[in-house]
C-alpha cells in the first residue's frame, strides 16, 4: 500500500503541482546543507524501513528520550537527502496543562522557488490507548507504527527520491509534533474536550511559520496510510477547502489503477493537522487518511488501541 501512495504522490509533485491556483518558544534553528500518469518507481521496502526505524526508538511522546532521539534521526535523514532543514521548538500546553517540549521539523527542497507544495505528517505518538476494548490498557502508550510513523515513512521516501531528482517546484516536508496529545476518553469529564487540544504543533507552525508570510499552492497530509488494505475516501474538510486538488489526485490514482484504494466517494470530517494549517494560513490542504465507513468513529479497529 505504501508503494501505491508513493507513486501517487510523486505524480502530485511533478504534475498536479505545476498548475497555478499559552506557549513559549525557542528560536528556529536553520541547518543549511554543505501532464502524465506515469510515476517514478519508489521503494516500498525503504518506506517500511523508515517506519520500522521510528518504532525502534520507542514511544515518540514529547518530553521523553525516545522522542528526542527520533527527532534527531528525522533531521539527519532530511539533511542527508539534501533538504534545507529548520527545527522549530516550542513549549506547548497539553489538555491538562502539561508543558510539552515540542519540535516541528521542516525540510525544504528548492528553497528559492516561489511556487511551493506542502507535504506533512505528524511524528509524535499518542500516550494513551483510550479506545482499546480493555480499559486496563487505556493509559498505555501506542507504538504508532500506522498512526504517525507511516505518513512520516512515506514522506521520507519521497524526500529520498527528491534528493536524487529535484522537483520542478519548491517542496516543503513538515513533520508536525504534538498532534496526538488530545484529551483522552477517560478524562473528558475533567478537561476540555474541544478540537484545540489536538494538533498543537501544526497550529503553532500555522501561527509562526518557519518563513514569515509562507505560502504554498496547496498542502497534503498523510495520516494512517500504512495499514493493510487501507482505503481513502474524500474527507469532508479537504473537499470544503481543497476539492480541486482532491479530485485531481483521485483521478490520477484511478488512471494508475489504484481506484480500489482511492474511493470516489465522500467520507466524514476529521480533526487533523490539515484543518489547523487551513485555519491559520489559508493554504488549501487535503487529508489522505484511512477511513472505515462501517466504523462508528470512521477509523479502523486498531485506532488508538
Show the residue positions of the predicted features.
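C-terminal motif of bacterial Sec signal peptides marking the signal peptidase cleavage site
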Residues: 12-15
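Short, low-complexity, disordered segments immediately C-terminal to signal peptides
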Residues: 17-35
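N-terminal capping segment at the start of a domain
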Residues: 29-70, 81, 296-305
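A non-catalytic alpha/beta surface segment that caps or lines the substrate-entry region
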Residues: 52, 59-112
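Solvent-exposed loop/turn segments at secondary-structure junctions
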Residues: 61-62, 91-94, 111-113, 123-127, ...
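Active-site-adjacent substrate-binding region
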Residues: 89, 99, 218, 225-305
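Acidic/histidine-rich catalytic neighborhood of metal-dependent amide-processing enzymes
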Residues: 139-244
Amino acid at each position: 500500500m505504501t508503494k501505491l501512495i508513493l507513486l501517487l504522490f510523486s505524480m502530485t509533485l511533478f504534475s498536479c503541482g505545476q498548475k497555478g491556483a499559552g506557549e513559549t518558544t525557542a528560536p528556529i534553528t536553520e541547518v543549511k546543507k554543505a501532464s502524465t500518469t506515469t510515476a517514478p518507481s519508489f521503494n516500498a521496502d525503504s518506506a517500511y524501513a523508515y517506519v520500522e526505524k521510528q518504532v525502534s526508538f520507542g514511544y515518540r511522546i514529547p518530553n521523553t528520550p525516545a522522542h528526542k532521539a527520533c527527532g534527531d534521526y528525522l533531521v539527519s535523514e532530511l539533511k542527508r537527502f539534501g533538504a534545507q532543514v529548520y527545527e522549530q521548538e516550542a513549549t506547548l500546553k497539553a489538555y491538562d496543562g502539561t508543558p510539552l517540549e515540542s519540535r516541528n521539523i521542516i525540510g525544504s527542497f528548492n528553497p528559492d522557488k516561489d511556487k511551493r507544495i506542502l507535504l506533512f505528517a505528524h511524528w509524535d505518538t499518542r500516550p494513551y490507548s483510550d479506545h482499546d476494548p480493555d480499559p486496563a490498557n487505556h493509559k498505555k502508550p501506542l507504538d504508532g507504527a500506522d498512526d504517525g510513523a507511516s505518513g512520516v515513512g512515506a514522506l521520507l521516501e519521497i524526500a529520498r527520491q527528491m534528493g536524487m531528482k529535484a522537483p520542478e517546484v519548491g517542496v516543503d516536508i513538515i513533520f508536525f509534533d504534538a498532534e496526538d496529545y488530545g484529551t483522552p476518553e477517560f478524562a473528558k469529564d475533567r478537561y476540555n474536550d474541544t478540537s484545540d487540544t489536538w494538533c498543537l504543533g501544526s497550529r503553532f507552525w500555522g501561527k509562526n511559520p518557519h518563513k514569515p508570510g509562507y505560502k504554498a499552492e496547496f498542502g497534503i497530509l498523510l495520516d494512517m496510510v500504512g495499514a493493510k488494505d487501507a482505503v481513502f475516501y474524500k474527507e469532508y474538510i479537504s473537499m470544503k477547502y481543497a476539492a480541486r486538488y482532491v479530485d485531481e489526485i483521485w483521478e490520477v490514482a484511478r488512471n494508475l489503477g489504484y481506484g480500489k484504494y482511492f474511493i470516489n466517494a465522500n467520507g466524514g470530517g476529521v480533526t487533523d493537522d490539515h484543518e489547523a494549517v487551513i485555519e491559520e494560513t489559508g493554504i488549501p490542504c487535503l487529508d489522505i487518511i484511512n477511513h472505515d465507513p462501517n466504523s462508528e468513529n470512521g477509523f479502523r479497529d486498531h485506532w488508538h488501541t
